[in-house]
Each structure stands twice: as C-alpha cells, then as structure tokens.
C-alpha cells in the first residue's frame, strides 16, 4: 500500500496504550492491571482492483487521517504521550515491553494498546506489571488486518483511563510494511529490528525504517552465533534514514533497556511534545 500513501524522507526528531470486565483506577504512580475485551474493528478487505481499489484505498487513508487527528486531540486533552512500537513478527516487542514496564511502571502511569490478529497471548504476558492494557484483535477479514489503524486505536481508548496516564505505548501488529502506512495519533514511532532478520532489511522494507524516530536493534545477545554484519546494517540504515536514533538492546539480557527507558522518560519530560508531521 506504500505506493498509495506518500512518505516524506525526513521529519523532526527529538534531540538527544482481555480479560477482566472491569479495572481499578490507578493512584498517582502505579496502575492495577486492567485488561479489557477487544471491540470490533471492522473489515477493510472488501475492495476491488484497479481504479476502484485506488479510490477505496484513498478513502480509507483519508478517513484514517481524520480519526488519527481525533485520537491526537484526545491524547493532548488527557496530557498523555503516545509511542507507536512497530516491528516484524517475532522481533521481541512484547518482551521489550515487559522489561520496560518492570522498570518504569513503579514511577510512571502507563497504558498499553496491544494489537494482534488473534489471541490475547501477548496482552496476557504484560499483566502483573501495573499497566492498564486494552487488547485489539484485528482478525476480521481475510486472515486479519496486518496493522492497527486509527479507528482501531480509537476503539481502545474508552477502555483506558487516559486522563490518569503519563504514557501509552501501542504495540502494533507484527508486520514490516502496513503499520508504517497508518498514523494513529502517536507522538513518536519506535521500530524494533532483530539481528536475526539480516542486515539488508532497511533496503528491502524502507518505509518502516524511514518512518521511525528510533530503531531498536534487538537480540544482540545472539550476535556471537550469527553471521550478521553490523557495519553493513548501519550503512543500509543510513541510506534509508541517516538521522534516525539507534539503540542496541537485548530484551532477554536487559542490555540497552535502561537507555530505551531513558528515551521514553525524556519524551515525558519534554513539555508539549510536538507530534510528527507525516
């Protein structure tokens, strides 16, 4: 879908959000676990090919932009900062978030919007850390939607106590293309790349790398066992997005997680974080 939706080559970077049917409101620093049932997110799969398909896609993207602006207004009104976390399937987003919540949830009020095609498995893994969690399953359509769009995120907002949160992290559906196509009202985008994916990924899937404000290079604990050329990866990344921030992390060992948490904390500490213009 990238050919239907323009992506600027650059955008501003900073310097350097089910199971129980109810939830309890958090105190000033921590949240009791809140894990709510997903709602219907609709089906975008029924369009035709050719000119009709282009017209329908343009309508979808236009409506998405409208809802993304409404989401952004809701986030601004609540005073909450929002990060859209994207990656390929299996890159390690959920494990990263578990480690993030372990460190930040005692000090910051955090909500998670968990996007998956089916199941609540990842949302379940994030229980017990004090975050409010809203699950969105995208399984309608032919195999399910491969991304969260702005209306899907909007469907999760009534299930989060936005006015009581400092930070919402959206764990997008695992996919290297579609999530980057749809703004959801976020302040910043972080992309997780696993070294097991190979150093050519920025060249093969440039849209997501280009749209990211931060690239997290995960699974560094596996580097001794892989034929991964870190210098070639960085050259390829620079060819696509030379100004992007990069952090090496291992969600399994904890390497780099404090630096990632510092990146998030800096966003929260910056008054009036400016939304990215895409």
Where are these regions (language model features)?
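Extreme N-terminal, non-catalytic leader segments
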Residues: 1-83
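Nucleotide-state-sensitive switch-loop elements of NTP-binding domains
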Residues: 47-73, 77-80, 91, 100-186, ...
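G-domain G4 guanine-recognition motif of GTPases
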Residues: 88-89, 113, 117, 194-195, ...
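Hydrophobic positions on the alpha1 helix immediately C-terminal to the Walker A/P-loop
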Residues: 96
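Conserved C-terminal guanine-recognition region of P-loop GTPase G domains, centered on the G4
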Residues: 179-187, 193-244
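Canonical P-loop GTPase G-domain recognition
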Residues: 222-278
């Amino acid at each position: 879908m990238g050919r239907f939706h323009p992506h600027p080559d650059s955008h501003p970077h900073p310097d350097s959000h089910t199971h129980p049917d109810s939830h309890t409101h958090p105190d000033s620093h921590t949240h009791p676990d809140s894990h709510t049932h997903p709602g219907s997110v609709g089906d975008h799969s029924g369009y035709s090919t050719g000119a009709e398909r282009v017209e329908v896609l343009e309508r979808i993207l236009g409506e998405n932009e409208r809802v993304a602006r409404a989401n952004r207004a809701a986030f601004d009104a609540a005073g909450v900062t929002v990060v859209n976390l994207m990656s390929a399937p299996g890159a390690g987003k959920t494990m990263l978030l578990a480690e993030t919540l372990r460190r930040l949830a005692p000090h910051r009020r955090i909500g998670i919007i968990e996007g998956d095609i089916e199941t609540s498995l990842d949302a379940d893994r994030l229980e017990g850390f004090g975050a409010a969690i809203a699950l969105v399953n995208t399984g309608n359509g032919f195999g399910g939607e491969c991304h969260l769009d702005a209306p899907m995120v909007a469907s999760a907002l009534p299930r989060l106590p936005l006015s009581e949160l400092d930070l919402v992290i959206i764990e997008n559906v695992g996919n290297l293309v579609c999530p980057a196509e749809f703004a959801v009202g976020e302040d910043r985008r972080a992309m997780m790349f696993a070294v097991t994916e190979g150093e050519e990924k920025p060249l093969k899937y440039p849209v997501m790398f280009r749209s990211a404000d931060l690239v997290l290079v995960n699974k560094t604990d596996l580097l001794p066992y892989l034929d991964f050329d870190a210098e070639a990866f960085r050259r390829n990344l620079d060819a696509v997005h030379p100004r992007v921030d990069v952090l090496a992390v291992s969600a399994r060992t904890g390497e780099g997680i404090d630096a990632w948490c510092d990146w998030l904390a800096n966003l929260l500490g910056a008054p009036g974080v400016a939304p990215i213009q895409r």
